[in-house]
Amino acid sequence: MKAIKDDNIRFLVNWTLLSTILIPLGAILGYFVGLSVSAAFGYGYNGGEPPFVSTVVYCCWGTVMTTIISFIQWRMLSKKIKLSYLWIPLCVLGFIVGESIVGILLWKLDIQRGDLGWAQGGSILAEALIFAFSGTLIGLFQYTLLRKSYYKAEMWILVSTIAWGLIPLVIFIFGGLTLGAITGISLIWIFKLKTK
């Protein structure tokens, strides 16, 4: 019993530490990819680009960030549970679909997505809501993998929503710590509810 507890603590510490490092790293690398994509369309990264370009930029930025974090998550989870590599594209897809839906809504409302970003001086609450929406989709998509083996795996949707939504509120460095702690604790709890 002590070995299981020690293994869970080790998992939680590693999961949280890696999230703390990788969320900001992914955000920084994604920023440069987004900047390059914006420049390829003939714009800077300070807003002002058309809604389509803005949506593409944020999707590219998010793709880099979610690919990095979900790859490491998958590697760690695969050591504890049987988990498909689809964990990675489902995370990326959730973020892209979320940003695309937000991009379309903002375009219809004549609001520039780039103006909402906290790094551009926009509302951190708006950024948190956008991240929470994408987190909901990420959780929903990843739930399809967890539900096959774990009772109450639907909690992952709520956990993902909260964890991703908190990232902008506590800035990305501490957002990674927050995401890692919340999702790590939740996964340990979900693992205890194995159905098969």
Could you tell me what each predicted segment is?
Residues 1-196:
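Juxtamembrane/disordered regions of integral membrane proteins
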